[in-house]
Amino acid sequence: CDTESGEEHNRSRDWGDEPTKRQMMRNMFSGLFFAHGTPMIYGGDEWMRTQYGNNNAYYIAADNEWNWFRWGEWQSTSSHFRARMHDFVRNLSRMRKERMYAFSPKEHGQGMPFAWKTQYNTNMSGTDWSGKSTMIHYYNDDNWDKPQILIMMNMERETRTFTLPEGVTWGRILDTQSYFDRGDILDEPEGFFTDNPDFDTATSANITLDTPQIIE
């Protein structure tokens, strides 16, 4: 790490192991791509490029190996993890484009309605906003008839049980916790979830469901 440049007030955390660290990267990417507005990332973020702690790459003395693009890392022992993170981000971009009606409305306040919910599917109150387990529900009203979207976020260090909205058939489309164990897809099909079930969300994971269009 370059200890000579950058300011000292940094907020960082060593997650202790590489799988957890990559999981948190996927959480950050999914939060960014599912937010309103234009996702903006640094070049190389999609394949886990790092500056090894140097947060001041614009400093003239920072023109060194800490900040260069190390293209050879694609051929390193961790190259398969980098390739799969690249695939994850690419698929996130595709998923966002397919749901622009929710994540990127053309006019402010004109997008699909949504509500912040607790893990118990209740409306958020003042004390709930400081919690680490929440849901975002994009739902239909009199003006909308699109596939609904439910984003479950659990940043606790243990599994949390979420209550899904009633009367809706859900299918899982994203699981940040299991991606690297499941190959070059965002998630494997696991059937549909109906009848207001409970859904266990793993430690420090984001799970996204939507209402699939059934073609008869």
What are these language model-derived features?
Residues 1-17:
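Alpha-amylase-like alpha-glycosidases and glucanotransferases acting on alpha-linked glucans and related
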